[in-house]
């Protein structure tokens, strides 16, 4: 059974997220007041492509693997959502179904805000609209950067950029002096 309360570490991950920490205390309070906690084991399905958008989600612990399935049936990992990151809002805004699958990568804790509560918070806080616009603008900039990289960088350079991103997000010092880092996320080579 899910523990309905975030651990201290999970709460800290949510509160220290770059976007969430920029919100006013009253908006953060209302979001957290409406959120429910769900815990998943490695590989647990969080949301499936084609599902109606019922929840806005934040990763509090572990990671969420966002993927798609190719025509041949192969799972393709698009990204990993790290603790402190919110997602799933696009489908709530446009009313379309989920576009990708989301799975727990390792033991994962998420926060979920029901679609109805999300809309109530939007109605109560005009600041929330502006914050969501900033969040979407940052995502669009990231997407343009990815498209540019795909069209201008060789595979080696794209791989190097991805490794740097993973170290920034999941890096763990592997030597006592911190001179080496390892990625604290179990990945298969093809991912």
Report the location of each language-model feature.
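Phosphate-/nucleic-acid-contacting segments
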Residues: 166-191
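Cyclic nucleotide-binding regulatory module and flanking cytosolic helices
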Residues: 1-42, 91-92
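N-terminal positioning helix adjacent to the helix-turn-helix/winged-helix DNA-binding module
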Residues: 151, 155-158, 162, 188
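Transmembrane helical bundles of ABC transporter permease domains
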Residues: 144-147, 151
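Amphipathic, well-packed alpha-helical segments that form the structural scaffold of globular domains
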Residues: 32, 36, 137, 141, ...
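Cyclic nucleotide-binding regulatory domains
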Residues: 19, 44-107
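Residues that recognize and position ribonucleotide moieties
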Residues: 21, 38, 57, 79, ...
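Cyclic-nucleotide recognition modules
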Residues: 27, 79-137, 141
């Amino acid at each position: 059974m899910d523990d309905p309360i975030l651990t201290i570490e999970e709460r800290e991950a949510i509160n220290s997220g770059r976007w969430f920490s920029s919100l006013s205390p009253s908006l953060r309070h209302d979001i957290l007041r409406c959120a429910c906690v769900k815990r998943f084991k490695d590989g647990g399905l969080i949301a499936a492509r084609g599902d109606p958008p019922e929840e806005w989600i934040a990763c509090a612990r572990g990671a969420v693997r966002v993927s798609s399935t190719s025509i041949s049936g192969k799972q393709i990992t698009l990204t990993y959502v790290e603790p402190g990151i919110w997602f799933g809002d696009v489908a709530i805004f446009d009313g379309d179904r989920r576009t990708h699958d989301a799975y727990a990568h390792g033991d994962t804790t998420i926060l979920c805000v029901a679609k109805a509560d999300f809309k109530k918070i939007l109605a109560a806080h005009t600041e929330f609209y502006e914050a969501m616009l900033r969040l979407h603008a940052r995502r669009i900039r990231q997407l343009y950067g990815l498209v540019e990289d795909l069209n201008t960088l060789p595979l080696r350079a794209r791989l190097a950029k991805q490794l740097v991103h993973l170290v920034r997000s999941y890096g763990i010092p592997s030597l006592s002096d911190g001179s080496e880092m390892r990625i604290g996320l179990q990945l298969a080579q093809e991912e």
